[in-house]
Structures are given as structure tokens and as C-alpha cells.
Amino acid sequence: MQKDRAAYDEMYELIRPVVKAKTVLELATGTGLIAKHIVNAAAHIEATDASAEMIAEAKRDNRSAKLHFSVQDMFCLPYADKSFDVVIVSNALHIVPQPEKALAEIHRVLKDEGALIAPTFTHAGNSFFGKAKAFFMKLAGFPLHSRWTGEE
């Protein structure tokens, strides 16, 4: 667990300068951990999730007027074209059934010079433990749908 926490702490440190004074959309926010850890750097964050239960949990200890949580469908967002400077979608694109549809919607709401931040902590490709983790994720209902390389 300490290793996971250290990875997330490092991720927050890397994200903060990118979102500094920017409008941010976070998709698949879950309990809102990323949004809550970076909100002080951003101008405003819209943090969304498909799960009403997750959003209710995220709202429980939100004390920032710059952070708004709502239930939204990442495939059909209610925001105007080119609304956000930064879109964050962490640990989600590899498990959605149509990642290309989600990416098209992200592209629509992201400003022309905007940034997409999409960290995914899954598994190390062809290692034994990576393959085992992918197998058990599939059994749990979270199959790996797509892989992207730097060129893509």
C-alpha cells in the first residue's frame, strides 16, 4: 500500500504544474482523490463519475469552492466544445468498452492547446505478474480492451 501511495503522491506532484490556474475536467473521478489533491493548483475542477454512489462519497469531505462533483456519462458530456484546458482520466480508459468513443468526447471538450492526462496503473505488459493481474482483472469483469503506445 505504501508503494501505491508513493506512486499517487508522485502523480499529484506531476499533475499540479500542468493544471496550474487552468480549468480541469476529471472523468471517472471515483471518490475524488486526484481532484482533491490538485484543486489548490487549478482555477476550477469539474470532477465526474458515472456512479452516483462514488460522487456522493466524493462530495462528503469537499471543502473547496473550486471543485464541483457531478454524475456524468463520459460518452455524452454536457459541456460545450473546447471548454477545458486539461482533461484527466485516470485508471479508466483501459476498462471502458469503447475507449475511442470516450477519447472523441474528450477531444470535443478539450481546448485546442489543451492537455489530456491519462495515467493508468495496470500491469507490466508481458511479465508473469502482469499477465496474472490482467487475467484476474478479466475474471472480475474488467478486461483490458486496448493498449496504446507512444506513437499512437
Feature map (PLM): residue ranges:
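Conserved class I S-adenosyl-L-methionine
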Residues: 115-144
